Amino acid sequence: MEPFSCDTFVALPPATVDNRIIFGKNSDRLYDEVQEVVYFPAVVHDNLGERLKCTYIEIDQVPETYAVVLSRPAWLWGAEMGANEHGVCIGNEAVWGREEVCDEEALLGMDLVRLGLERADTAEKALNVIVDLLEKYGQGGNCTEGRMVFSYHNSFLIADRNEAWILETAGKYWAAEKVQEGVRNISNQLSITTKIAREHPDMRNYAKRKGWWDGKKEFDFAAAYSYLDTAKMMTSSGRYCEGYKLLNKHKGNITFETMMEILRDKPSGINMEGEFLTTASMVSILPQDSSLPCIHFFTGTPDPERSVFKPFIFVPHISQLLDTSSPTFELEDLVKKKSHFKPDRRHPLYQKHQQALEVVNNNEEKAKIMLDNMRKLEKELFREMESILQNKHLDVEKIVNLFPQCTKDEIQIYQSNLSVKVSS
């Protein structure tokens, strides 16, 4: 399988405005995979010895898990990207290198994303959670639903209100880079070179034993663990370089809207089209002022250029995200038994979005009407969120239903577009 999949970005002061950290990710997956946006509340687990069912394996549960909002392929337990109630955001990428990928079922990188969010209240603690689980349970297993086998190692971009971490893995070996200012992005290649803040204790010795490092030159993680001919990975390296250029183009003035425009960029390949396409997108505002709420925007639909970024804010008693939640099927039946039957996982928003796109694809006038209405809704939402951040006022009663109501407003645009008459 060719290395097509995802781009994740972070921008920190002084690259951003208003002392905010901005996180963004495009999830690039198979064209027919549905991604849902779901919320799970915080839970105290009183049952000592409780076991947790992840996508393929069971692991030990912890005494307490935090509230999380996730954007995830609807067939699995983990997530491609998400955030928790403490302002921690994580996105993962598929990476390949010299260390052989294991098809044996273990924790998926997407499981590790969710576990990091559920168990950590800072970015570095999330890194600790992930590397500890990686050591204990390993990573591996098919990352797609159905007959096709698609396995990979993972890199992660983890951010909170104060800093970001890049964590890149090769089997059980890993390196981590701390990011405290400026911009950083990851794609489908190892990108940590000599700036290593933390690492697996045997990472260098293993590379030396394998003949990947002579023990004399300054250790370069990407050079040691990447394929000999990384030039063959032109697609991922191209997107990585293009993403870096786009971030630096706006350096000093990056806002959440800037990040959305980067995710919508098609010439760079960041907004991907084809067999693998951008199935969902996420952008988060993480104010360094802890009195301000973190705001997380999700699309829940393919192609951010033709989707609406809808805001989510953590408050008590969040309304269920029914319109972006897929029908439930037993993982035991469909994943554990390796069923080749792919059920219809389309949630209400996805269904209306796809129906509307089918209508407008061959009708430029309808397409313009729909897109104009989508951007109008988005701009209204952006103004409301900016007002919350500037005025430091949060109407909790309204916020509990914020994301569900935005989703209903988006669905109404698609329904109206399906019935609107245009001039001949």
Curated annotation (Swiss-Prot):
UniProt xrefs under InterPro entries: Peptidase_C69
GO BP term (any one): detection of temperature stimulus involved in sensory perception of pain
GO MF annotation terms: cysteine-type exopeptidase activity; dipeptidase activity
Glyoxylic acid (Cys): modified positions: 6
Post-translational modification Pyruvic acid (Cys), affected residues: 6
Active site per the UniProt annotation: 6
Propeptide: 1-5
UniProt-listed PANTHER family: SECERNIN, SECERNIN-3
General function of this protein: Plays a role in thermal nociception.
UniProt record similarity statement: Belongs to the peptidase C69 family. Secernin subfamily.
Protein name, UniProt field: Secernin-3
Gene responsible for this protein: SCRN3
